Amino acid sequence: MWSGRSSFTSLVVGVFVVYVVHTCWVMYGIVYTRPCSGHGRCIQPYLAQRPKLQLSVYTTTRSNLGSENNVDLVLNVEDFDVESKFERTVNVSVPKKTRNNGTLYAYVFLHHAGVLPWNDAKQVHLVSPLTTYMVPRPEEVSLLAGGPAAQQIEAEKRPTSALDEPVSHWRPRLTLNVMVDNFVFDGASLPADVQRYMKMIQLGKTVQYLPILFIDQLSNRVKDLMVINRSSTELPLTVSYDKISLGRLRFWIHMQDAVYSLQQFGFSEKDADEVKGIFVDTNLYFLALTFFVAAFHLLFDFLAFKNDISFWKKKKSMIGMSTKAVLWRCFSTVVIFLFLLDEQTSLPVLVPAGIGAAIELWKVKKALKMTVIWRGLWPTFQFGTYSESERRTEEYDAQAMKYLSYLLYPLCIGGAIYSLLNIKYKSWYSWLINSFVNGVYAFGFLFMLPQLFVNYKMKSVAHLPWKAFTYKAFNTFIDDVFAFIITMPTSHRLACFRDDVVFLVYLYQRWLYPVDKSRVNEFGESYEDTPQRKPHTD
């Protein structure tokens, strides 16, 4: 049996290693481009001639631009230097069609200085929507005082169905890049990702590619979007420019395609935005480290869930285990899952929380020795009996909870009242979930104390699932890294560091109360070594 479990774990680890190596090879293929070896099919860079260029940005309500009619010039950068970084904010006139839930497009031209883009055969251009459709985020108000009178009147006029309808939002940022590497491409093996951004011309006997213009869509974040009202005649637009290398350009193209694919597979704008934030707000080298950390996090998540389920599946007795701690973990994980769901947290955080909540519900059934009997549509619950040793454990458990209740209940009630008076929420449900989860996060470590107290009274930690604890500890330290990378509520960040402290206390107890290898444990295993127990003073 042991061999079967070991083989399965080895298989999972082996698949994980192959996946990591394959991903590294794919990433290398993305950022590395083979240069031309010198034969006649080389494609030279037009920028190597240092032409005088001009950058022009126009806006229009049409997705296809045939002429210069019905366009507004919003930015004109004469004597444009591709090596110089800049950022400028301009006011854009919003047409009536756009204010009525229409779309507005930005046309970005890179052309020769002093020549209109429509008259320049060597111009390059890209189009990008300046608006997007999204359901507006519910406004937060004080639940006791209510919102401002104007907000309440506007909300009453708005039909209920309109609250869930997507409306036009303004993208206040337009990020531009030009690839500045004087790279000579091999015409026989052009990268497909870059080729769709390339425009080539014939100059004499050589083929040259015009400057590669790129619009960074990953920089458009949901948190920056502005709802377009019918009174919005002008809106600000920040146009920023920076040069980009070929390797980074190819990586960015692939990331944009990946985000687009997520949206095509049904990911919401919010979930796709969380993925964008990882790439935009993080250094690329740190991002590579994050990938490996995330991969190991998924592996340890799987191994922790597997060993935890295996431990509880075999467990027939609750000797040495705090039932109150099991009930608390179940309550806290369910509340945390509902809280993360209400906060629209990213899927990498939400999915493991949901799986953990389901496992904790199953563990409560095991801890209470509960049997569910279905009689038609109505379930009947039967509870098993406890042995003398289990009842003694329950006494220690109840004693620890009695002391904790004197501190816990006043703090939780006081915190809920304070947040109701001073913090704005979307709804009463949001306040209730936030109050529960703040109690879970802020005082959750107190509910871990009953198990520590039971360990102290029994002078043993042999009854704990140490394999699952070890994998969870690895993930706790990984969560400390993710707390600064992935978007999550502040209270969830603090909880990551709280778990570090608790695990260190468990390690201290494991050192203080070594496993008695001379006795048979609950799995029927025994060892020959005689333990050297360290002295302990009550």
Swiss-Prot record:
Organism of origin is: Bos taurus
| The protein's role, per its UniProt record | Scramblase that mediates the translocation of glucosaminylphosphatidylinositol (alpha-D-GlcN-(1-6)-(1,2-diacyl-sn-glycero-3-phospho)-1D-myo-inositol, GlcN-PI) across the endoplasmic reticulum (ER) membrane, from the cytosolic leaflet to the luminal leaflet of the ER membrane, where it participates in the biosynthesis of glycosylphosphatidylinositol (GPI). GPI is a lipid glycoconjugate involved in post-translational modification of proteins.
GO CC, sorted alphabetically, is: endomembrane system; endoplasmic reticulum membrane; membrane
Query: Which PANTHER family does the record match to this protein?
Result: CLEFT LIP AND PALATE ASSOCIATED TRANSMEMBRANE PROTEIN-RELATED (PTHR21347), LIPID SCRAMBLASE CLPTM1L (PTHR21347:SF0)
Q: Which residues are glycosylated?
A: N91, N101
Which compartments does it reside in? Endoplasmic reticulum membrane
Q: Quote the protein name from its UniProt record.
A: Lipid scramblase CLPTM1L
Q: Which is a Pfam family this sequence falls into?
A: CLPTM1
| Bilayer topology annotation | Multi-pass membrane protein
GO biological process: one example: apoptotic process
Chief location of this protein? endoplasmic reticulum
Between which residues do disulfide bridges form? none
Reaction catalyzed: a 6-(alpha-D-glucosaminyl)-1-(1,2-diacyl-sn-glycero-3-phospho)-1D-myo-inositol(in) = a 6-(alpha-D-glucosaminyl)-1-(1,2-diacyl-sn-glycero-3-phospho)-1D-myo-inositol(out); 6-(alpha-D-glucosaminyl)-(1-octadecanoyl,2-(9Z)-octadecenoyl-sn-glycero-3-phospho)-1D-myo-inositol(in) = 6-(alpha-D-glucosaminyl)-(1-octadecanoyl,2-(9Z)-octadecenoyl-sn-glycero-3-phospho)-1D-myo-inositol(out); a 1,2-diacyl-sn-glycero-3-phospho-(1D-myo-inositol)(in) = a 1,2-diacyl-sn-glycero-3-phospho-(1D-myo-inositol)(out); a 1,2-diacyl-sn-glycero-3-phosphocholine(in) = a 1,2-diacyl-sn-glycero-3-phosphocholine(out)
GO MF, any single term: phospholipid scramblase activity
Print the organism lineage.
Eukaryota, Metazoa, Chordata, Craniata, Vertebrata
- Topological domain spans for side Cytoplasmic: 1-10, 306-324, 424-428
Q: Where is the chain membrane-spanning?
A: 11-31, 285-305, 325-341, 403-423, 429-449
Q: Its family?
A: Belongs to the CLPTM1 family.
User: What keywords are assigned to this protein?
Assistant: Apoptosis, Endoplasmic reticulum, Glycoprotein, Lipid transport, Membrane, Transmembrane, Transmembrane helix, Transport
Instruction: Please give the residue ranges for the topological domain Extracellular.
Output: 32-284, 342-402, 450-538
